[in-house]
């Protein structure tokens, strides 16, 4: 893998997910994380790591976390890869 041009740690709020129906909250959280990274990293090509998915779905679809801490890396080709940031 090439060197990362930009690397940021974001704390992504997922408050708005609670407005979705209970059975859609997990999927909505993943979509919101991807949309946040598209907006802040200025790239449409966003890949989420398996660890982010596991964290969101940890308590099931109806109870995603209120916020999530993510490390995002943007590469030369414009691709953004995101993984769960260690605390």
Curated annotation (Swiss-Prot):
InterPro entries: Ribosomal_eL31 (IPR000054), Ribosomal_eL31_dom_sf (IPR023621). GO terms for biological process: cytoplasmic translation. GO terms for molecular function: structural constituent of ribosome. It comes from the Archaea. The keyword Phosphoprotein does not apply. GO terms for cellular component: cytosolic large ribosomal subunit. PANTHER family: 60S RIBOSOMAL PROTEIN L31. This is Large ribosomal subunit protein eL31.
């Amino acid at each position: 893998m090439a060197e990362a041009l930009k690397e940021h740690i974001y704390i992504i709020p997922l408050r708005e997910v609670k407005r979705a129906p209970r059975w859609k909250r997990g999927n909505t959280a993943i979509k919101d994380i991807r949309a946040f990274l598209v907006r802040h990293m200025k790239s449409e090509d966003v890949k989420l790591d398996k660890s982010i998915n596991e964290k969101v779905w940890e308590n099931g679809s109806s109870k995603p976390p209120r916020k999530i801490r993510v490390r995002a890396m943007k590469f030369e080709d414009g691709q953004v890869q995101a993984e769960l940031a260690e605390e």
